[in-house]
């Protein structure tokens, strides 16, 4: 077989083992098809001459290069696998880089007709087979003259013989003079001889079919296992055949049936002789593998599905054996797939190692290894069978085969994961072991896994169990064999692989170059077994029943057939360029190469940055123990630098600081450990490929870093762009982020409830003791106990009263409903009276101005948060709506702040209570949708009251014992003879007792009227509280200096008119804008990178800022009442200073206290700037018209109890429909929180709190019913159909009766409380059942 390179074909990458190639062969209907696409990495090992020039760029994802043979004529199509298939470490001269270089098209053509049917058979088909089965290259017209010279070697098959039987295993006869092969199948055990002179092959004897056909009727004893009705004997479905060594070279062992090993004599070929010598029986399940000992030739080892290794001595008397083995070893693992003795080849020219010392290998006559279904590789010594010498987790899936290195302590394993891994299983006790006898690894995988690999001086590798190299084939490996040849350097060894599947080929790899096989031997059907006859001749059997043989000295290498012309961009962004030199390298390494690598490695290690240097003399694992991280391990000279992570690491989930994101030559994880371009070019002893970095321009790098830093800041921000693109995502985002409730639990009564419960428990214990010891209630001790318990209960009740959230202003004792119910017993009348009294007290508390202000502050905070959420998705209309609501609430807070703290609700309302009850039911747990904490506005108001009031608001006279009013204006409006006033649309009456400065008020009224006549346009400034208060101070100072002051103007009934204070000065920051300067304001929202305080705990991300929001500069703009006038037109009358904060809180005052309003003087009445109730009702109606469900429901839930927006029936129906809508979008936690914290309990009706959960048996699948009378002994955890319980808790070993359960990664289940106790309280990290894998 030969490949014809095309000028458009990619070149094979240089270096020993640098190219990763995954090849596949398929054939159908007897046709050999071939199409190839080779993919190779862009960088190669040190002893290769291929040069690679890389422009600096980011690391590409790992690729898996594949090529296949699928058609007779080559096609131009190809495909690439970008998944990372090589998870193991690289060998020393394998590719230093995991990345694959995508190659171009390779048009290839094969000639000749593949063998078909019975065209070739017997001993006369070898010549014809040779001419037909071999491929003759056809040179295409596009081939260059230089490429035609590579056709010196043609792929030829030397032996090709059809057996006409189903065969599945092959082995050689270990007698060089016989030149024989043994092939076995279900009904065939044949002895074949071949000749290297004429390439002929002949079946000498069939030990199964021949003896069965020639056996006379009276001589059935020759084959005792054959009955008279049997047409032919069968060996086994899992067939394996082996031949003995030396004096037992004539012994053949096969699996006669699934649990027996049959021994045949090769020399007994006549019908009169029984070829079967002995049957070894002892396994309880099928035998998968067996092997002859090369040193102690009388020993046979076998392993099977029962997980036992048995050693047989064929010298033992079979009559005395009685089905017992001479040695039985229980491996305590799963079934054994393959077992092999350590070989002891007697190489005639076996030299010493490179340093003149003999090789240090284990005792071959006592050592064996086994591979198991779990992927575990075990090494044993017969002299100590109770202890495993080595235990290695070789594969992620089942291990299928293994093979020992011919003369060194290495084992190659193949598994279902498609990997062929090389493991060192010897003991490196000598610190001066030469690296030349084995290898010196210098690949990038060694920095990740095993630079402590083969031949590292003084390296304690016995406990690391890291593969020295890994070959990825992409298909499960069923057979592998080392070439029986001595190689001074272990990486120069060849290994033949046979894969499971449709790959009709045998791949021969050099360990020095693991990505591209050295030879590719194609067959007509998938290969089932292979064997090396010597170091050059290899045989295999395929599923078509053919025996094929090749001489690898006459076979071309795959590397010679690869095209060499390719230029590619380094990555998707196009920041690097790759091309190849035409020198492809070789498959071998030399001693000089290792000397160069060792020298360069030491030089690079000593020149690395301090703290990042790894000590080569003690190995990588020792360096890791000394504290070197994965990123700071010094690289080998030809190794690709570890890729620099992005600004936000997906592994650590911690943003990387900008100091580690500087330019490429400054990063500790980039090219700092590589030599510069001049240094590389000066080192002429280094072989290609050379890594030459080209630094990016500083401007580009700076721009790139800026983007990374910006991305780092926004790493926790949700992807708003994806949210905006879908209406469903917008709905889910708003449902999670918006605040639907501001209420929180009254957690302060938990302590009282806990103390009460403890006291009740103690009382129950004492009562039980009294009954148990028959102590009378009249006894002294009993009376003491009862008296003590009563005192304890009273003390608990008093504590609960003090900590109850329901507190009256007069500090009267009101007990909580729970304690009232306990004390009332069966007296329901008394309990109902207590509840009624509690409701009345709640009403009284609701009319407290301080309580109202705190309530409004919570609503302001929720409104501000909702506005910020809408600004995230650039929803400007809804953002403005919530800003409008917030400003309206702030106006209400301003109105209530003018009330005196010692004014009772009766004084404020005239004895009538119309304020609706806010929430009389007991609160539940804290909501996941809102912060529900203390308002920042409230705390800011308490800490900095001067920000909201003038200096004159605080009275300096503390000796009078009267609390100073919050507002000076309120004090001026109070009369001395009146102790009540009514808050309505007009301030109708003033008490003279409350206002000692009546003359000043009269003068103020006169001055105000004069100012109003001169400049009525200044009335627009009356909305700012600070201006009003400062104007009052100026007026007071002016009035104090006026000696002609005579008192205020009054009407005939001595009623003082309201006085709006106006000023001509320029506008100042209003009261509303003052509130907008806190962190919850839109301006503060735009000035912070993300919302830490406004984010919902259940969402997990902070909301990003909106730079395009409408309120970006709103807080910094002076407040003009004209701006507010656009939102709420109004007029201001000369007799109206204030109003009720809302219509729901509007109180009908006493008619006897009303005073007729003054006559209007031409100016229309100016309405107040805000009317919250009307505003909210209009917003709700508009939301219903526009179909804005979230806004409509949000307004109802937040403000219904305060402002009475809609009838209660409509509110409940709206909430129910919204909850069902949340269920449709699987927002169950949001719906549950809304139902939990809304003020109405009966939203879903009587069945709203009920759920039906059907539990089925996990074994039989039947529905488990809990019938009456069976709930105590059985319950929902016992199945009546199969009479078995469900899964038991792995901790307490009791049935899982609750719905709250947990399952571990290993599959064990248990109660959540049990797992909490096991993992959290006790601090365990493993499964309670004893699983070996760590779970935490």
From Swiss-Prot:
PROSITE patterns documented for this protein: WD_REPEATS_1 (PS00678), WD_REPEATS_2 (PS50082), WD_REPEATS_REGION (PS50294), ZF_RING_2 (PS50089)
Keywords, alphabetical: Metal-binding, Repeat, Vacuole, WD repeat, Zinc, Zinc-finger
Major site of localization recorded for this protein: other
GO cellular component: cytosol; GATOR2 complex; vacuolar membrane
Keyword Zinc-finger: yes
Entries under Pfam families matching the protein: WD40, zf-RING_16
Subcellular location per the Swiss-Prot or TrEMBL entry: Vacuole
Skewed-composition ranges (Basic and acidic residues): 942-954, 1010-1019
Protein name per the record: Restriction of telomere capping protein 1
Annotated organism of origin: Candida glabrata (strain ATCC 2001 / BCRC 20586 / JCM 3761 / NBRC 0622 / NRRL Y-65 / CBS 138)
Organism taxonomic ancestry: Eukaryota, Fungi, Dikarya, Ascomycota, Saccharomycotina
């Amino acid at each position: 077989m030969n490949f014809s390179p095309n000028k458009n074909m990619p070149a094979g990458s240089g270096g020993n083992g640098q190219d990763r190639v995954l090849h596949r062969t398929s054939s159908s209907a007897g046709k050999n098809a071939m199409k190839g696409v080779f993919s190779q990495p862009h960088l190669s090992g040190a002893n290769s001459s291929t040069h690679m020039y890389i422009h600096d760029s980011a690391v590409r994802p790992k690729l898996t290069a594949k090529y296949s043979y699928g058609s007779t004529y080559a096609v131009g199509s190809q495909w690439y696998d970008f998944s990372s298939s090589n998870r193991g470490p690289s060998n020393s001269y394998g590719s230093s880089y995991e990345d694959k270089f995508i190659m171009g098209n390779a048009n290839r053509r094969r000639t000749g007709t593949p063998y078909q049917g019975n065209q070739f058979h017997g001993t006369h088909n070898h010549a014809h087979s040779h001419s037909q089965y071999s491929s003759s290259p056809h040179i295409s017209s596009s081939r260059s003259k230089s490429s035609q010279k590579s056709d010196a070697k043609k792929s030829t098959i030397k032996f090709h013989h059809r057996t006409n039987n189903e065969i599945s295993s092959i082995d050689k006869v270990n007698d060089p003079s016989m030149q024989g092969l043994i092939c076995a199948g279900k009904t065939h055990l044949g002895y074949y001889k071949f000749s290297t002179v004429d390439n002929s092959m002949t079946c000498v004897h069939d030990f199964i079919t021949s003896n069965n056909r020639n056996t006379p009727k009276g001589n059935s004893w020759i084959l005792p296992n054959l009955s008279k009705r049997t047409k032919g004997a069968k060996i086994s479905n899992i067939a394996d055949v082996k031949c003995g060594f030396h004096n037992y070279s004539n012994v053949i062992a096969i699996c006669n049936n699934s649990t027996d090993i049959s021994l045949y004599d090769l020399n007994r070929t006549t019908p009169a002789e029984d070829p079967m010598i002995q049957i070894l029986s002892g396994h309880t399940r099928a035998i998968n593998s067996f092997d002859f000992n090369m040193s102690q030739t009388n020993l046979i080892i076998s392993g099977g599905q029962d997980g036992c290794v048995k050693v047989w001595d064929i010298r033992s008397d079979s009559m005395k054996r009685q089905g017992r083995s001479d040695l039985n070893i229980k491996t305590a693992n799963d079934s054994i797939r393959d077992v092999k003795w350590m070989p002891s080849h007697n190489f005639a020219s076996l030299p010493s190692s490179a340093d003149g010392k003999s090789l240090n290998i284990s005792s071959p006559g006592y050592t064996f290894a086994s591979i198991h279904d779990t992927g575990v590789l075990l090494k044993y010594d017969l002299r100590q069978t109770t202890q495993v010498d080595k235990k290695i987790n070789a594969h992620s899936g089942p291990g299928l085969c293994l093979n020992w290195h011919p003369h060194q302590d290495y084992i190659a394993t193949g598994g279902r994961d498609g990997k062929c891994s090389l493991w060192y299983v010897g003991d490196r006790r000598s610190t001066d072991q030469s690296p030349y006898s084995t290898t010196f690894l210098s690949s990038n995988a060694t920095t990740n896994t095993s630079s402590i690999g083969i031949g590292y001086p003084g390296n304690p590798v016995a406990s690391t169990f890291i593969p020295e190299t890994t070959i990825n084939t992409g298909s499960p490996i069923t057979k592998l064999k080392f070439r029986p040849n001595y190689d001074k350097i272990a990486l120069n060894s060849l290994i033949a692989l046979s894969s499971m599947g449709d790959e009709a080929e045998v791949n021969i790899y050099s360990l020095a170059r693991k990505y591209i096989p050295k030879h590719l031997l194609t067959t007509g059907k998938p290969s089932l077994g292979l064997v090396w006859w010597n170091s050059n001749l290899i045989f295999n059997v395929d599923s078509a029943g053919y025996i094929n043989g090749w001489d690898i000295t006459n076979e071309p290498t795959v590397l010679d057939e690869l095209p060499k012309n390719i230029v590619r961009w380094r990555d998707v962004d196009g920041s690097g360029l790759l091309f190849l030199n035409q020198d492809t390298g070789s498959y071998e390494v030399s001693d000089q190469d290792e000397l160069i690598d060792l020298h360069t490695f030491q030089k690079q290690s000593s020149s690395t940055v301090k703290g990042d240097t790894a000590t080569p003399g003690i190995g990588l694992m020792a360096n890791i123990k000394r504290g070197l991280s994965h990123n700071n391990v010094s690289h080998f000279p030809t190794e690709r630098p570890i890729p620099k992570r992005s600004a936000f690491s997906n592994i650590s989930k911690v943003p990387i600081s900008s100091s580690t994101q500087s330019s490429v030559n400054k990063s500790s994880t980039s090219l700092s450990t590589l030599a510069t371009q001049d240094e590389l070019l000066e080192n002429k002893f280094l072989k290609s490929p050379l890594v030459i970095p080209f630094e990016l321009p500083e401007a580009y790098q700076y721009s790139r870093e800026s983007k990374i830093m910006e991305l780092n800041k926004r790493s926790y921000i949700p992807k708003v762009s994806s949210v905006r693109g879908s209406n469903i995502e917008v709905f889910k985002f708003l449902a999670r982020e918006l605040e639907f409730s501001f209420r929180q639990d009254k957690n302060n009564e938990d302590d009282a409830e806990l103390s009460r419960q403890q006291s009740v428990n103690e009382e129950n214990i004492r009562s039980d003791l009294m009954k148990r010891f028959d102590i009378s209630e009249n006894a002294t001790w009993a009376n003491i106990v009862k008296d003590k318990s009563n005192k304890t209960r009273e003390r608990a009740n008093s504590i609960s009263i003090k900590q109850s959230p329901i507190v009256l202003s007069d500090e009267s004792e009101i007990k909580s409903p729970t304690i009232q119910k306990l004390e009332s017993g069966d007296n329901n009348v008394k309990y109902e009276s207590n509840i009624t009294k509690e409701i009345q007290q709640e009403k009284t508390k609701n009319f407290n101005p301080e309580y109202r202000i705190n309530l409004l502050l919570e609503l302001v905070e929720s409104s501000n948060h909702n506005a910020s959420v809408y600004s995230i998705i650039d929803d400007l209309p809804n953002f403005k709506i919530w800003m409008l609501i917030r400003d309206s609430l702030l106006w209400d807070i301003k109105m209530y702040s003018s009330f005196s703290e010692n004014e009772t609700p009766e004084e404020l309302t005239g004895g009538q209570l119309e304020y609706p009850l806010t929430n009389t039911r007991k609160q539940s747990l804290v909501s996941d949708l809102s912060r529900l904490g203390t308002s920042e506005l409230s705390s800011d108001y308490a800490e900095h009251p001067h920000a909201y009031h003038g200096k004159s608001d605080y009275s300096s006279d503390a000796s009078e014992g009267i609390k100073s009013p919050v507002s000076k204006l309120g004090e001026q409006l109070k009369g001395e003879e009146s102790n009540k006033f009514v808050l309505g649309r007009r301030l109708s009456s003033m008490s003279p007792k409350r206002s000692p400065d009546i003359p000043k008020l009269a003068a103020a009224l006169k001055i105000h009227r004069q100012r109003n006549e001169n400049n009525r346009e200044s009335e627009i400034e009356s909305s700012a509280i600070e201006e009003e208060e400062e104007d009052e101070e100026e007026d007071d100072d002016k009035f104090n200096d006026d000696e002609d002051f005579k008192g205020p103007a009054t009407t005939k009934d001595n009623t003082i008119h309201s006085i709006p204070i106006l000023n001509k000065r320029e506008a100042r920051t209003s009261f509303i804008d003052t509130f907008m300067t806190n962190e919850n304001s839109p301006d503060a929202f735009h000035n912070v990178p993300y919302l830490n305080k406004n984010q919902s705990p259940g969402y997990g991300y902070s909301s990003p800022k909106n730079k395009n929001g409408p309120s970006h500069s709103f807080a910094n703009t002076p407040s003009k009442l004209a701006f507010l006038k656009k939102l709420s037109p109004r007029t201001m009358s000369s007799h109206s200073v204030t109003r009720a904060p809302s219509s729901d809180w509007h109180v009908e005052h006493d008619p006897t206290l009303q005073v007729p309003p003054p006559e209007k003087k031409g100016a229309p009445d100016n309405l107040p700037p805000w009317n919250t109730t009307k505003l909210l009702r209009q917003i709700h109606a508009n939301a219903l018209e526009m179909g804005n469900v979230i806004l409509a429901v949000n307004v109802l839930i937040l403000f219904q109890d305060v402002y009475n927006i809609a009838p209660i029936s409509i509110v409940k129906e709206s909430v129910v429909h919204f909850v069902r809508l949340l269920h449709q979008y699987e927002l169950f936690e949001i719906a549950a929180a809304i139902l939990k914290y809304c003020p109405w309990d009966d939203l879903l009706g009587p069945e709203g709190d009920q759920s039906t959960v059907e539990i089925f048996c996990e074994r039989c699948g039947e529905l488990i019913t809990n019938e009456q009378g069976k709930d105590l002994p059985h319950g929902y955890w016992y199945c009546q159909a199969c009479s078995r319980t469900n899964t038991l808790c792995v901790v307490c070993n009791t049935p899982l009766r609750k719905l709250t359960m947990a399952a571990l990664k290993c599959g064990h289940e248990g109660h959540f409380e049990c797992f909490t106790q096991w993992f959290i309280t006790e601090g365990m990290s493993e499964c309670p059942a004893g699983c070996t894998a760590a779970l935490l």
